Amino acid sequence: MLLVIDVGNTNIVLGIYDGQRLVRDWRISTDKAKTSDEYGILIRELFRGADIEFKDVKAIIISSVVPTLSGVLERLSRNYFGYSPLVVGPGIRTGMPIQYDNPKEVGADRIVNAVAGYEKYKTSLVIVDFGTATTFDYVNRKGEYCGGAIAPGLVISMEALFQRASKLPRVDIVKPPAVIARNTVNSMQAGIFYGYVGLVDEIVARMKAESKETPRVIATGGLAGLIAPESKTIEAVEEYLTLEGLRILYERNRE
């Protein structure tokens, strides 16, 4: 079995693959203070609930946008599984030309998503990933990663509103009953939700115009399912896009 680990600023997503089949997946909170032993104990409990043992895992691949946790999880891999993991970063074989001024600046998660998206659709793509930041990535019809845009994530936007405006409460991110809201909570939800739908559609529209192609638009990330139904541009939600990209990259880098 292959263990894939996607480390984000807010959540860590883990998946177990048996060949090309995703057997189980878990989402846990990112905690920069946790040690490799603490993560090891947590993963053991997750595995126990799925009737999986450490010895069942034969390889590990990690994508991380949190540098302080990269070393922690590499130690976890060696100490608990007996393997040095494959880490997504400079030098890894992606099979995708990266047309970025400095390829080392591109977040690992963005490349992983691009690889998975192009492998599935084999056409030009806009990939919208609703994470701590919301990223928009463009892959052209030749399968080249061309770059994209980065916007504050939904949760960051809502938290900023709560923290910087004294009289505004912290609220859940949900679709409100109306745009013309009749109370403060719904008003905040309307502004964030519909404002974000507009942000997504406008950036996607401009990417399409600039590219002079007709890309397929897909979304992933924890809040993709909330925004996509209201978006005029998102055509599909790929819940496991990043995990699938990690599996593909592992296969491309096997010795």
Swiss-Prot record:
Active-site residues from the entry: D109
UniProt GO BP: coenzyme A biosynthetic process
The protein's annotated pathway: Cofactor biosynthesis; coenzyme A biosynthesis; CoA from (R)-pantothenate: step 1/5
Binding site for ATP: D6, V7, G8, N9, T10, N11, I12, V13, T132
Catalytic activity: (R)-pantothenate + ATP = (R)-4'-phosphopantothenate + ADP + H(+)
GO cellular component terms attached to this protein's record: cytoplasm
Compartments where found: Cytoplasm
Binding site for K(+): D129
Entry binding sites for substrate: Y100, G107, A108, D109, R110, T184
Cross-referenced CDD domains: ASKHA_NBD_PanK-III (cd24015)
Enzyme Commission number(s) from the entry: 2.7.1.33
Family matches, as InterPro entries: ATPase_NBD, Type_III_PanK
Keywords: ATP-binding, Coenzyme A biosynthesis, Cytoplasm, Kinase, Metal-binding, Nucleotide-binding, Potassium, Transferase
Keyword Metal-binding carried by entry: yes
Essential cofactor(s): NH4(+); K(+)
Cofactor binding note: A monovalent cation. Ammonium or potassium.
Signal peptide: none
Keyword ATP-binding attributed: yes
Biological role: Catalyzes the phosphorylation of pantothenate (Pan), the first step in CoA biosynthesis.
NCBIfam families: baf (TIGR00671), PRK13318.1-5 (NF009847), PRK13318.1-6 (NF009848), PRK13321.1 (NF009855)
Family recorded in the similarity comment: Belongs to the type III pantothenate kinase family.
Subunit structure: Homodimer.
Protein name (Swiss-Prot/TrEMBL): Type III pantothenate kinase
